[in-house]
Regions:
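Short, Lys/Arg-rich flexible segments
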Residues: 1-72, 81-141
Length: 141
């Protein structure tokens, strides 16, 4: 007995329906979820009340999240930066800054502070996995 089976599967259609097509819908949703869950961990500016969390950009394809601003890097690293010539945290315009070997103190610590993405993933990584798995039609293990 001979058995012949023919299938007409369109992988691109299946992937696109699950947000995994060339439009990167699942990746964009992942980036938006990470930004939302990182929010309580991102340092908050004192004085002006402005949050650094509002100064981010998600890449058009969802592949990266960039926190903008002249202070974003040292906030993320968590080290006081000083001017190379002045030795002051209030460096002159155009003066290069270097780490001073002292940790920053954060308003809202210990929740808000350095390495906010890593700390969020340590605390809520399972939630991120569940959200993405649900979005693409799967189940988190």
């Amino acid at each position: 007995m001979k058995l012949s089976i023919r299938t007409d599967i369109k992988p691109e259609t299946i992937l696109r329906a699950r947000g995994l097509g060339s439009d990167n819908a699942a990746q964009k949703m992942l980036a938006q979820t990470v930004v939302r869950l990182c929010d309580p961990y991102v340092p908050m500016s004192s004085g002006s009340g402005a949050h650094m969390k509002t100064a981010y950009t998600i890449a058009p394809d969802g592949s990266s999240i960039t926190y903008r601003g002249p202070y974003a890097h040292f906030q993320y690293v968590g080290e006081v930066m000083v001017g190379t010539r002045s030795g002051s945290p209030w460096a002159k315009s155009g003066e290069k800054k270097v780490g001073a070997g002292r940790a920053l103190s954060y308003n809202g610590a210990p929740m808000r502070g350095r390495d906010w993405d890593k700390r969020m993933m340590a605390d809520r990584g399972d939630e991120v996995v569940k959200v993405v798995a649900s979005y693409v039609g799967g189940k988190a293990k």
